[in-house]
């Protein structure tokens, strides 16, 4: 299981509101076989393998461009753990057990 944090930022928009661009990216993710969680600062992803993750990243990136942005800045953090099959909720629960 691969977990990741994705942030896609449209640049040069005429507004400080970015929710319509985020919505376009999420609509693109809905069409794929990845689990996602939206947060106030980015989107968390779970994928079975790197190819599946990168397909989702590309889809979200392209969706923001298609939504009208002429320039997009995308950041991606990947946790590719292969010794155990742990998802996003497992990570949160592990911390909660310790506090």
UniProtKB/Swiss-Prot annotation:
**Top-rank taxon, per record:** Archaea
GO-annotated cellular components: cytosol
Cross-referenced Gene3D superfamilies:
3.30.70.930
- How does it associate, per the subunit comment? Homotetramer.
Assigned protein family = Belongs to the UPF0045 family.
Q: What is this protein called?
A: UPF0045 protein MTH_1187
Q: Which organism is it from?
A: Methanothermobacter thermautotrophicus (strain ATCC 29096 / DSM 1053 / JCM 10044 / NBRC 100330 / Delta H)
């Amino acid at each position: 299981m691969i977990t990741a944090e994705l942030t896609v930022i449209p640049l040069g928009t005429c507004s400080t509101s970015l929710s319509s661009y985020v919505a376009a990216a999420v609509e693109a993710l809905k069409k794929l076989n990845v689990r996602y969680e939206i947060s106030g600062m980015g989107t968390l992803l779970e994928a079975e393998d790197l190819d599946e993750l990168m397909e989702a990243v590309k889809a979200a990136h392209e969706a923001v461009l298609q939504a009208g942005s002429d320039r997009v800045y995308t950041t991606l953090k990947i946790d590719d753990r292969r010794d155990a099959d742990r998802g996003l909720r497992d990570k949160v629960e592990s911390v909660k057990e310790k506090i």
